[in-house]
Amino acid sequence: MAASAMGVLQEREVFKKYWIEHSVDLTVEAMMLDSQASDLDKVERPEVLSMLPPYEGKSVLELGAGIGRFTGELAEKASQVIALDFIESVIKKNESINGHYKNVKFMCADVTSPSLNISPNSVDIIFSNWLLMYLSDEEVERLVERMLKWLKPGGYIFFRESCFHQSGDHKRKSNPTHYREPRFYTKIFKECHMQDDSGNSYELSLIGCKCIGAYVKSKKNQNQISWLWQKVDSEDDKGFQRFLDSSQYKFNSILRYERVFGPGYVSTGGLETTKEFVSKLDLKPGQKVLDVGCGIGGGDFYMAENYDVEVVGIDLSINMISFALERSIGLKCAVEFEVADCTKKDYPENSFDVIYSRDTILHIQDKPALFRSFHKWLKPGGKVLISDYCKSAGTPSAEFAAYIRQRGYDLHDVKAYGKMLKDAGFVEVIAENRTDQFIQVLQKELDALEQEKDDFIDDFSEEDYNDIVDGWKAKLVRTTEGEQQWGLFIAKKM
């Protein structure tokens, strides 16, 4: 334990030395470690602030406040801001810039110090921007526990980190920064629990996780990632997201699906059907595409790389987005990813040229409301393309009904599905029954899987192999009997 503690103390000194070295020039360029900082700051700062929950009249704790890029903006609306940084010259610079705000308290303190005294249940929002990457794994874990205590019930933690690799172009003699995988942060925050003196149990619920769009646009870089968490009762129902990530879309399940569908894909036909369907969209360079239920991002990378479009990929599954972000490393394409519930998102009118969704909307119970949102979000002349599981008209058999229930699906026949799009205001609606193609693709995937049985079992397990094979055979039975169908839908906004 003593050796471990000594190592942590030494690492803390390394980080302090690193930031003293990079705080000689107290400028935005020095703080962001980037020669383009001034231009980036103009678009990135408003974007980051837009991700926060409402903070008017709230108490905000800003950890790693630096020279105050965000302090003044927070002070404009918050009732109180505590701006904290562990480099004295930096926090003094912040005070010289923002000291005229009487609702800001400036503190020179280290977030890892046990002597840092913040009262329990006293803060509405904890905000940090590039902080945790300068802490050890153990320090991150301890800080998350303390932050949960400092927050009022219902309060929020927002943080943003550089993941995978550095983004700034400043030359550095050494770089002790921890460029972690996003799933490291997600796991630690998700697993943090506490009990207060009254016996109430609390945990953190993920509200959102996304790339910083300014970095995707300017640097084709998805490694700037933000999270928003809320302090909730441990008994609160976490709903559909937890169901997805703990059952159908566990990490291992996603990897199994990808093995069947091909690298980057977790939906029917993988790259082959993606090429066919995307070719129907007449995509033009610079157009903006929303992919609803983007999975692990293969279709988004394909569109961005081959058609030079900008893609926003959203998925409710934290695990899916974690994989998508990892797959984006080094691709240098204009794709943003976000953990989001499409039924709760609200984009401005006329935001997208295309909305694309593959075998996802089967999870959505109120499709008419979602299609009305799609219509609103599309630009005039914009297109929607959806492939989805459907059912034959009439009452399903007991077995198929049980399958639908177990998966939590909401299925319609192809004609009814097309009518829902028409009723939402779309024109030129094409509703095609593609079940024959679905059967061919299923059989092809099953044949390929059976041919590489030994390799699959080596990489996963025999149980995993049997699970996938049985699932594909069951789908083939349901589709050949005509109960389960597959629809392709294309429609246009006038």
From Swiss-Prot:
Give one Pfam family.
Methyltransf_25
Q: How does activity depend on pH?
A: Optimum pH is 7.8-8.5.
Cysteine-cysteine disulfides: none
Keywords, comma-separated and alphabetical: Cytoplasm, Lipid biosynthesis, Lipid metabolism, Methyltransferase, Phospholipid biosynthesis, Phospholipid metabolism, Repeat, S-adenosyl-L-methionine, Stress response, Transferase
Q: Name one GO biological process term.
A: methylation
Q: Which InterPro entries match?
A: Methyltranfer_dom (IPR025714), Methyltransf_25 (IPR041698), Phosphoethanolamine_N-MeTrfase (IPR025771), SAM-dependent_MTases_sf (IPR029063)
- Give, as in the UniProt entry, the pathway in which the protein acts: Phospholipid metabolism; phosphatidylcholine biosynthesis; phosphocholine from phosphoethanolamine: step 1/1
The residues listed in the UniProt record as binding S-adenosyl-L-homocysteine, with positions renumbered to this chain, are G64, R69, D85, D110, V111, N129, V266, S267, G293, D315, D341, C342, R358
Keyword Kinase set for record:
no
Induction, per UniProt: Indauced by salt stress.
Q: Where does N-methylethanolamine phosphate bind?
A: Q248, Y249, Y257, Y389, Y403, R407, G408, Y409, K475
Which reaction is recorded as catalysed by this protein? phosphoethanolamine + S-adenosyl-L-methionine = N-methylethanolamine phosphate + S-adenosyl-L-homocysteine + H(+); N,N-dimethylethanolamine phosphate + S-adenosyl-L-methionine = phosphocholine + S-adenosyl-L-homocysteine + H(+); N-methylethanolamine phosphate + S-adenosyl-L-methionine = N,N-dimethylethanolamine phosphate + S-adenosyl-L-homocysteine + H(+)
Activity modulation notes:
Inhibited by phosphocholine but not by choline, glycine betaine, monomethylethanolamine or dimethylethanolamine.
What subcellular locations does the record give?
Cytoplasm
Any GO molecular function: phosphoethanolamine N-methyltransferase activity
- Give binding positions for phosphocholine: S162, S167, G168, R172, Y179, Y257, Y389, Y403, R407, Y409, K475
Primary location recorded for the protein, binned into one broad class: cytoplasm
Q: Which CDD domains match?
A: AdoMet_MTases
EC numbers, comma separated: 2.1.1.103
Any single GO CC term annotated in Swiss-Prot or TrEMBL for this entry: cytoplasm
TM helices/strands, residue ranges = none
What does the record note on quaternary structure? Monomer.
What this protein is reported to do is described as: Catalyzes N-methylation of phosphoethanolamine, phosphomonomethylethanolamine and phosphodimethylethanolamine, the three methylation steps required to convert phosphoethanolamine to phosphocholine. Mediates a key step in the biosynthesis of choline, a precursor of the osmoprotectant glycine betaine. Has no ethanolamine- or phosphatidylethanolamine-N-methyltransferase activity.
Q: Which family does it belong to?
A: Belongs to the class I-like SAM-binding methyltransferase superfamily. PEAMT family.
Q: What name does UniProt use for this protein?
A: Phosphoethanolamine N-methyltransferase
